[in-house]
Amino acid sequence: MKLTIGYVGLSHLGINYAIASAIKGFNVVCYDDDKNIISSLKKKKIPFYEKDTEKNLKKKFKQFKFTNKINDLKNCDLVFISRDVPTDSNGKSNLLEIKKLIKKIVKIIKTECNLIILCQVPPGFTRSIKWPSNRLFYQVETLIFSNALERALFPERIIIGKSLNKMNKKYNFFLKKFKCPILEMNYESAELAKISINIFLISSVTSTNILSEISENIGANWLDISNALKLDKRIGKYAYLKPGLGISGGNLERDLETFRNFLKFNKIYENYSKNIKKISNYRKDWIYIQFKKIIKDFKSIKKIGILGLAYKENTNSIKNSPSIFFIKKISFNNKFKVNAFDPKIKKLLKHKNINICKNSNDLMKNCEILVVATPWKIFKKINLNKFTNIKDVINQYNLTNFSINRKKKKHIGMGN
């Protein structure tokens, strides 16, 4: 069966899922009203950093049509709505633009086209769309920044929200190419399943961070404890047991805010989500708390070096990044000169007072306090003993190969 797949909204999500569709053998039409994104993709350039994505775009380029003409979607058999839904500073979604976009799309696609909502929307959204229910679906995406294409190509399962009708043949043919269990349920169940996945992740991250801090305070070692937890079948080896700096990236925050609204509306456990958010914000302060302890001992310190600006390794996204959170905290004090290096971030438009170094070596030579804010693998190779100018290291991710003479320098890790 020959199918043409359309993607509307060339976000991180849309581009990776479109490339996955091409790898599975389908021709793909990619639409976005942003001419700069279309121009970039036509030149085989991805507007963000993601492992293997650009390489596979080049391999499958002949199967793509990139366009900002909405009518080019007319002959698609499946159309995925994959545009980012914007959020405010609290994580609340603004659905106005996505609703307008869908209204435009349903006016031009053919009547037998399958319309699939792929972006993050609250329960009840998909059912409200005016399109024949036997061709209207919600597909749960479980994209992970830094591993997005692999997740799109090899999902553990695919969760589909649908009406009571049988699964559409064309859509079913497309889904079976991914060779994983397909879980069918009603629209609201699928929409809530997406939120449920993230709330479980958030709860796990939050519990890990609390227990890790207790470990620090009582002299326990969280790494030893986490190894024991992974061997418990009720928890498992893939659980989020590495302590971190709160919830970042934007997607988890969005679902936490949706979850909070449901709790408030139903008047149940309203403080649960509020407390999670408080703990997350407190954890984002971890670097700053350690920093304040250090400058009490070394009042002459002026040079700060930050290794890593992205909110996690293998991405260039800085949304809700702990390092940016720290930069905001110290930027009011002109006493400090701040240098930063990240392998995928070359400039900070909103923080022009931060000097971006060309490499880690330049940064290390020009700092007295070193903060390891993102656990990039290349940072593990750094030998701190070469840099006598560094007095203290805040290394919350406990990069195990960080060579350091602990007698000469303080080395502050997380969870131990």
Model-derived features: where do they sit?
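Structural/interface elements that position substrates and couple domains in central-metabolism enzymes
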Residues: 1-416
